[in-house]
Swiss-Prot record:
Gene Ontology terms, MF aspect: GTP binding; metal ion binding
Disulfide bonding pattern of the chain: none
Keyword ATP-binding carried by entry: no
The organism's taxonomic lineage, starting at the top: Bacteria, Pseudomonadati, Pseudomonadota, Alphaproteobacteria, Rickettsiales
Gene3D superfamilies per the UniProt record, alphabetical: P-loop containing nucleotide triphosphate hydrolases (3.40.50.300)
Cofactor(s) recorded in Swiss-Prot or TrEMBL: Mg(2+)
Name by which UniProt lists this protein: Probable GTP-binding protein EngB
Residues where GTP binds: 33-40, 60-64, 79-82, 146-149, 177-179
Domain EngB-type G, residue spans: 25-197
Keyword presence, Magnesium: yes
Family annotation (InterPro entries): G_ENGB_dom (IPR030393), GTP-bd (IPR006073), GTP-bd_ribosome_bio_YsxC (IPR019987), P-loop_NTPase (IPR027417)
GO BP field: division septum assembly
Residues the record lists as binding Mg(2+): 40, 62
Native species: Wolbachia sp. subsp. Drosophila simulans (strain wRi)
Length: 197
C-alpha cells in the first residue's frame, strides 16, 4: 500500500504568482505553518517518500506554492510557503504572502487547511495571527502538532490544552505527527485524505 501511494504521487507545479496557479480541477488540501515547522517532511511522510517534497534545515526556503498530484490528479496536496522567518527580501516576502492570501481565499477547490504547530514551542503569536485570519475568512482548518517525539507527554498535553483553549472550537481537530513515530500514519493519512472525497 505504501509503495502504491508513492507511485501515485507526482510533483506537478510550483506557483510563484497568482497567474501561474494551476487549474482547479481537483480537490486540494493545503499545509501551512511557520517556517521550518515541518510541512515538507509531513507531506513526504503522508505519501511515504523521502524526497517528493524538498526538505531543508534552513527556514524560509519554500517561496512558492508547491502542488503534488495524487492518483492521476484525483486530489492534490499543497505545500504553502512558511510564514515568519525567511531569507527572501521584503518585496519577495510581500509577493508570496499576497499569493498565499489569494490562494486561501479564492481557491474554490480547497477542502481543508492543516496548520502545523511545532510541539516543542507550542502556539506562538504568529500562529495565532494566522489562525485568527483563517477564522475571520471562514476557511476550514485543522491543527497538526509536529515533532511530538521531542517533547514529554506532559508537555505535549499542555500544548494541546493551550491550543484547544485558545481556538475554542470542538470542530477543529488536533492531530499529532512525527517523522519518527510512524505506527499511526495510516489512520492519520486516512483522516487527512477524507477531505478530498
Amino acid at each position: 500500500m505504501a509503495k502504491q501511494i508513492t507511485s501515485n504521487c507526482n510533483f506537478i507545479f510550483g506557483a510563484s504568482d497568482i497567474k501561474s496557479l494551476p487549474n482547479e480541477s481537483a480537490p486540494e488540501i493545503a499545509f501551512a505553518g511557520r517556517s521550518n515547522v515541518g510541512k515538507s517532511s509531513l507531506i513526504n511522510l503522508l505519501i511515504n517518500s523521502k524526497k517528493a517534497a524538498r526538505v531543508s534545515s534552513k527556514p524560509g526556503c519554500t517561496r512558492q506554492i508547491n502542488f503534488y498530484s495524487m492518483y492521476n490528479d484525483k486530489f492534490r496536496l499543497v505545500d504553502l510557503p512558511g510564514y515568519g522567518y525567511s531569507h527572501a527580501g521584503k518585496e519577495e516576502i510581500i509577493q508570496y504572502l499576497n499569493l498565499i492570501e489569494y490562494y486561501l481565499i479564492q481557491r474554490r477547490n480547497l477542502r481543508r487547511v492543516f496548520v502545523l504547530i511545532d510541539s516543542k514551542v507550542g502556539l506562538k503569536e504568529i500562529d495565532k495571527d494566522f489562525i485568527y485570519w483563517l477564522i475571520c475568512n471562514n476557511i476550514n482548518f485543522n491543527v497538526v502538532l509536529t515533532k511530538i517525539d521531542k517533547v514529554s507527554q506532559k508537555s505535549l498535553g499542555a500544548v494541546i490544552e493551550d491550543i484547544q483553549r485558545w481556538i475554542n472550537n470542538e470542530n477543529v481537530s488536533i492531530h499529532q505527527m512525527s517523522i519518527r513515530v510512524k505506527h499511526k500514519i495510516t489512520k492519520v493519512r486516512d483522516e487527512f485524505f477524507k477531505f478530498t472525497r
